[in-house]
Swiss-Prot record:
Species name: Streptomyces avermitilis (strain ATCC 31267 / DSM 46492 / JCM 5070 / NBRC 14893 / NCIMB 12804 / NRRL 8165 / MA-4680)
Name of this protein: Mycothiol acetyltransferase
Catalytic activity as recorded in UniProt: 1D-myo-inositol 2-(L-cysteinylamino)-2-deoxy-alpha-D-glucopyranoside + acetyl-CoA = mycothiol + CoA + H(+)
Binding site for acetyl-CoA 2: 244-246, 251-257
Gene3D superfamilies named among the record's database cross-references: 3.40.630.30
Binding site for 1D-myo-inositol 2-(L-cysteinylamino)-2-deoxy-alpha-D-glucopyranoside: 47, 192, 231, 240, 278
Length: 308
């Protein structure tokens, strides 16, 4: 664990910036995140952010711990890995310690750490988060929709694969490199997904929810050209279209629709009542496809940024 600095923003607060968390610090942050999610009904930090709490230092990632006395009352994670966009942040204040300026203190520290170039998520678009963004001088520029549909009575036509295409399950270890390459190509315009590394993939394979039987690979002549990775949220009874991608050059032949259908049928067969997915609101074509498949917007995550 390395400590970059500690600042004292007043009101009995201290903010420590770390390149990595100790196991004890990670557990304390996870407990804070779980309590905030219980109260808010929405995680304040993404899956990627939670995975980055453990495993030591990660390139471009910093953790900000806000304490009042000896009590951890706030957390922010700053990720500076995009070669073009401003650093991205997620932050949360413990529900029992809100309304005391802690969120503003964290936001101000994030702006100072990034030279006032910042993007910040407000998961679920809660009013307090929107107000904080306004106070910090950030403006809305991205909306990420979570869409859902019932799986009961799913009535989808038999998937029609393009000529010469076969589908099989992912084999851990064997398919890692090929999948990372196709994922990078399919999401070259989307650094959050396209920049996933072997370490990121290994993190996910180590999670309890990982099941290669629900990770579908489409091949033509032995080459990977597309995939649909599903995820089961067992506690919530929800199946997710986790990642769906088609390699450039293989798009436009109906492979994406076929892979979507295959994944949804798999989730239905698990007895799950609901399917969900995430899609950018400005991706009108994808939103239209999912609406035709019976999905409707459930909630929206908002991203704000500085104007510089």
């Amino acid at each position: 664990m390395t400590s970059d600095d500690t600042v004292w923003p007043g009101a009995g607060r201290s903010i420590e910036t770390l390149a990595a968390l100790s196991p004890g610090q990670a557990e304390a942050v996870l407990a804070l995140l779980d309590e905030a999610a219980r109260v808010d009904g929405q995680p304040a930090v993404s899956e990627q952010g939670r995975l980055q709490l453990r495993g030591g230092e990660r390139e471009g990632v910093r953790h900000l711990l806000l304490s009042a006395g000896d009590t951890l009352v706030g957390y922010a994670q700053l990720e500076d890995t995009d070669p073009v966009e401003a650093p991205a942040a997620e932050l949360v204040v413990h529900p029992a310690h809100r309304g005391r300026g802690h969120g503003r203190a964290l936001g101000t520290a994030l702006l100072a750490a990034t030279g006032k170039r910042l993007r910040a998520w407000a998961h679920g678009g809660h009013s307090a988060a929107r107000h904080l963004a306004q106070v910090l001088g950030l403006t809305l520029f991205r909306e990420l929709r979570q869409m859902r549909r019932p799986l009961a009575g799913l009535d989808l036509a038999e998937p029609k694969l393009p000529d010469g295409v076969t589908v099989r399950a992912f084999v851990p270890g064997q398919d890692d490199a090929a999948w990372l390459a196709v994922n990078a190509a399919a999401f070259a315009h989307h650094p959050e997904q396209g920049s996933l590394t072997q370490r990121d993939l290994d993190d996910r394979k180590a999670e309890p929810w990982f099941d290669p039987a629900g990770f579908f690979l489409a091949e033509r002549d032995g080459e990977l050209i597309g995939f649909h990775w599903t995820k089961v949220h067992a506690q919530e009874g929800i199946g997710e279209v986790y990642v769906l991608g088609v390699r450039p050059g293989a798009q436009g032949g109906g492979l994406g629709k076929a892979l979507t259908t295959i994944g949804l049928r798999h989730l239905e067969a698990q007895g799950l009542p609901t399917a969900m997915l995430y899609v950018d609101a400005d991706n009108k074509a994808a939103v239209s496809v999912y609406e035709r498949l019976g999905f409707a917007t459930h909630e929206t995550d908002l991203m704000y940024r500085t104007e510089s």
